[in-house]
Amino acid sequence: MISSTSLFAPVDPELRLLTDNLKRLISARHPILGAAAEHLFEAGGKRIRPAIVLLVSYATLLKEELTPRHQRLAEITEMIHTASLVHDDVVDEAALRRNVPTVNSLFDNRIAVLAGDFLFAQSSWYLANLENLEVVKLLSEVIRDFAEGEILQSINRFDTDLSLDAYLDKSYYKTASLIANSAKAAGVLSEVSSEMADSLYHYGRDLGLAFQIVDDILDFTTSTEILGKPAGSDLISGNITAPALYAMEEKPYLNTLIEREFSEVGDIEMALNLVKDSDGIWRSRELAAYHAKLAGKQLDCLKPSAAKASLLALTDYVLSRLY
């Protein structure tokens, strides 16, 4: 499997600064809010979203050093992403993320919601200080999309009439919007043409969709220890994703289990087995590969560089997580 460390080599110095800068940017007057926010950044993660911002910045600037505004955009992007995770964990009543206790399990839901709100507020403040109205609009749209995606997921729980298009819309709002709009924002700060900015947006959109589809596959195929959350947790909570949508076409009884919300003994195990015994996972892999390929084609607008090579390799990295 391709390692994220090698992929992000062109922006390694900037990523090393990221965590320290984030802790400084979110320092709060109240110690509990500060402790909750710091715990989030200590939990780690691959920092894929800020890395994409930094790589796009290098690929469009073609200079040896980034501007402070590009670096700050990467930090804002990670701040927004982290805030969304905090709220997700509250809504999902999750106790673990990446095998680390969530803020809501360490503190409580009230503190977790406030910590997420605080991060969104801080990101908005630093976003405004970039003094670029188009970038402000792009990242503000992301925050709106997060809320819309969460609402869609909530109202569509256990809905066996959910379409693939509706699933992809929700996946865009919850995952791809941030990657798409932050990639475009990096291009805007580099003063690229509107055509190139749109290509960067579509790169992020399709990469983000591929990333989410792969995550949804891993929810069925990966152990709890590796996944950092209970296997099959999406389906159990009524969140119907691509593997289950495809499996429902092939295994009609899965619809029955979902509609009765796994209320009988053995329903969950049977549902997970029906998904695994269908072509749902294979078809989802094909769907992820389709979007990853579309993402790669959007990079034709960029001149050759180490940063462009890493952005292109990311489309393979996303799929390599399946193997």
Model-derived regions, located:
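All-alpha prenyltransferase/terpene-synthase fold signal
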Residues: 1-323
